[in-house]
Amino acid sequence: MPRRTDLNHVLVIGSGPIVIGQACEFDYAGTQACRVLRAEGLQVSLVNSNPATIMTDPEFADHTYVEPITPAFVERVIVQQAERGNRIDALLATLGGQTALNTAVALYENGVLERYGVELIGADFEAIQRGEDRQRFKDLVAKVGGESARSKVCFTMDEVRETVEDLGLPVVVRPSFTMGGLGSGMAHSDEEVGRMAGAGLVASPSANVLIEESVYGWKEFELELMRDGHDSVVVVCSIENVDPMGVHTGDSVTVAPAMTLTDWEYQRMRDLGIAILREVGVDTGGCNIQFAINPHDGRLIVIEMNPRVSRSSALASKATGFPIAKIAVKLAVGYTLDEILNDITKETPACFEPALDYVVVKAPRFAFEKFPGADPTLTTTMKSVGEAMSLGRNFVEALGKVMRSLETGRFGFWTAPDPQGDVDQVLLRLKTPTEGRLYDVELALRLGASTEKVAQVSGIDPWFVAQIGELVKLRDELVAAPVLDAELLRRAKHNGLSDRQITALRPELLGEDGVRSLRKRLGIHPVYKTVDTCAAEFEAKTPYHYSSYELDPAAETEVVPQTEKPKVLILGSGPNRIGQGIEFDYSCVHAAITLSHNGFETVMVNCNPETVSTDYDTADRLYFEPLTFEDVLEVFYAEEQSAAGGAGVAGVIVQLGGQTPLGLAQRLADAGVPIVGTSPEAIDLAEDRGAFGDVLTAAGLPAPKYGTATTFAQARRIAAEIGYPVLVRPSYVLGGRGMEIVYDEETLKDYITRATALSHEHPVLVDRFLEDAVEIDVDALCDGTEVYIGGVMEHIEEAGIHSGDSACALPPVTLGRSDLEKVRQATEAIARGIGVVGLLNVQYALKEDVLYVLEANPRASRTVPFVSKATAIPLAKACARIMLGSSISQLRFEGMLAASGDGGNVASHAPIAVKEAVLPFNRLRRADGAAIDSLLGPEMKSTGEVMGIDHDFGRAFAKSQTAAYGSLPTQGTVFVSVANRDKRLLVFPVKRLADLGFHVIATEGTAEMLRRKGIPCDEVRKHFEPPKAGRPALSAVDAIRAGDVDMVINTPYGNSGPRIDGYEIRSAAVSVNIPCVTTVQGASAAVQGIEAGIRGDIGVRSLQELHSAIGAGIAADNEVQ
């Protein structure tokens, strides 16, 4: 069946910012979708608010709209294209997660799609409703002979209470049409039911929740299926959760293929899955179905279905080599499975189900260390911020690799001191699912607990527990063996142990280098296998590799050189985490693409299954491997050996993947690996405060006074000399980890006690904190001689809030020409002083006309994608070319960089782009269910970002807020409670809100000040202030929780008593999902955004149009000059 000829123009909706529950797997899916559609000759319009994605690069669509993903904005795109005579024929929403699906449903229900003749493809409206609506799906499962958990859909709290009485406690609360289990949880008491169901009714777009019987402790499985228009169905992959029901699948360690299913259970699950897929009506695409099995009686029930490409779809794609998103798009435009060729084998059609002769393990990455108040218990609400995946020939080999891929400071079992406690305490901990529970499984077994006991208390299947038990036996052998011989060492490596783990057990081997030397002498090295989708039945034509240590010494590697071109290894960024996310993958992908087009064979090394970089056709060759020194070095050796007289490895790129590869640079260089671009010595120079200070002194550049301390006494002396407040942090961190503003000696002592434990090898840095300064971010390129300013960003929040959490504007809004000239001169001096070859990010603070240098990072920054989208300059591609020998003047001549000028010169009429951070406060809760504090500071907390771009700042800021958190209010009530130091500065923005018609309420002190300034204001009492006669009865928190407040402005009070009241105010705002502004500058920006919203003239423009306008502006400026 050929492609549909009635489709000419398809609209693709992305998933928006990276949030917990919806990450960069949808950039991977969306990028594939755009590639396929354009390859089929279709015109593509794309809507996605996330500038850090590959899919929003202008070359992936004909019309790229970096706009909020809301029904209103998507409708504007549809209308704009129709008015231009370029009507959109179809909407593909099954590749953008829950955000895209919910937006498509709203557009259908509002009549927009019918009005403009737009067809839903991939899954129609009825299929989405049947798959997503809890009650309809439950009825459908029963119709095909399946069973669901006993449950009822409830629309009111009265219905909830009746259902709980019928089912009995505990129950599971699941809101409809939400992602990542948002709002769901296990309720063990009536109080918990009330809290969770109340929150769930708010979280659900359809305002209903499913109350179902608890199946906590059951085994959980998933199937990935695809169906075409001829009713052919393939089961792509089965996935088993190591953690039992009760832990969200995104937070569980998962294994593919499923390990513990009987043949009867698998066949029953498969038959049910196919029947459900057909009954739901997903006839041109893929879906994910989750099942649970009672381990005691074998009862099998269907949990839920995603009638779209999901997080698990990305995992299944990378696990099998079967490109689910790509094939889903081909099915959506009319092809059938038998007409689509397998990209890996180039012979078999897509109707051949994948077969695996290896095991895949995925493990989640958490960020609880960033949120000390958050409850670390794993529940049905997803909390992980990223994940890693590994492949091995057996389960324990893959498990060992994935554990060291997570970069948590532990490199697998036995690489960190065991927590204190006896076996009973460890078993008690295992009853509550937490981040490190597999370590407790191993420890319990080592302390003498039986496999059965550990399985019983943890709910983990005995097979998985027994596999870890085999590792415990192997550990005992390694410790007891008089000599580490070839057979034992080979077995250790075959079972996934790293050199680091082995040296922890055998310290006489003198570290990793000693273990590696011993392996080499004994001829023990990894072989590299190929992911081929067919268990070696057909030859793989696509080089997608993983390592394994085979027991057979004669086993051979399957890596073969693709060309005689020189090879470049690109080290990715590993699992997403706060501080190191999709922005770095963006730069790695750009490097692979541009170097492949410029005479190099590109080799990607990464372990993140969500990313575009680990798509098998991004680089010329892919290694799905941990980003550790040992694993990267072995890949380098394999590539060198495979050259066989041809071109070897020209170099390894470490400066694009964030801190992870940077941390490997010096050791790799010492091992003889060529590092291209900025040298490891220059990287270290930028991190060494003393050496970097010398660079600044030579250039005559001021920096905040600072000192380096390794003891509290030293830190106290430095702080006394500098003057409080001071900024303290450990060296060599990303995302501001461990960074705090300290106001007094007592707090400093507390910090030093914690921070030195955080970083043993590097000292603590103590800086003067510049209050009320304007922070500036600069991304620049340097070829060793010439410097090219990519972009200058002005932070909206003041210095002291981490740059990754602060909104910023490009071009700067308040900086003058003289300020920009200071920035240029300082950046050029720093780039040359360090010796940068490639990208450089510098952060400045401007205070009283003095430009202070805060820090310089000779690497790609998280703002590179944003700057590239805002300026139309591909900084990451240019960086890759520069690192491999091109000059800036050459790139100007080729047209990759502007022929004259750069991002330090703002073109006339340039649009304003605003980047806003997206924070996970609605996901992470305290143990009592209360929201964690939304206050920002020097430690980064955001998971993702959005971009708003328009003609002026107000419109651009309004778009950024809509994309990140929902529209700013244009009427209603604003609550104001601010610290004394901020009251004078907040008078103007609050007066403007009152003039716009807002009702202002405030606590006593703030209300008195506002009334003195002529601003009408009603008073409410503080949360912890008892009601008094003649005083307001209503507290601020009561008003917020009652829904009587539309926006909160609350700046922190420092360490004084009112700080607790501020927490209650901010957490209440998070709970009811209203804007909560915590800085003066943020309030001023919000007012400008609200004014733009009231005017109502916010339109949409594609990046292609905006970039054309930028080019025209630059040309006009050049003519004037």
Curated annotation (Swiss-Prot):
Cofactor(s) this protein cannot do without: Mg(2+); Mn(2+)
InterPro entries reported for this sequence: ATP-grasp (IPR011761), ATP_grasp_subdomain_1 (IPR013815), CarbamoylP_synth_lsu (IPR006275), CarbamoylP_synth_lsu_oligo (IPR005480), CarbamoylP_synth_lsu_oligo_sf (IPR036897), CbamoylP_synth_lsu-like_ATP-bd (IPR005479), CbamoylP_synth_lsu_CPSase_dom (IPR005483), MGS-like_dom (IPR011607)
Binding site for Mg(2+) 4: E855, N857
Positions with a binding annotation for Mg(2+) 2: E304, N306
Binding site for ATP 2: R729, R768, L770, E775, G800, I801, H802, S803, Q843, E855
Family listed: Belongs to the CarB family.
HAMAP family according to UniProt: CPSase_L_chain_B
Protein name stated in the entry: Carbamoyl phosphate synthase large chain
Organism: Mycobacterium leprae (strain TN)
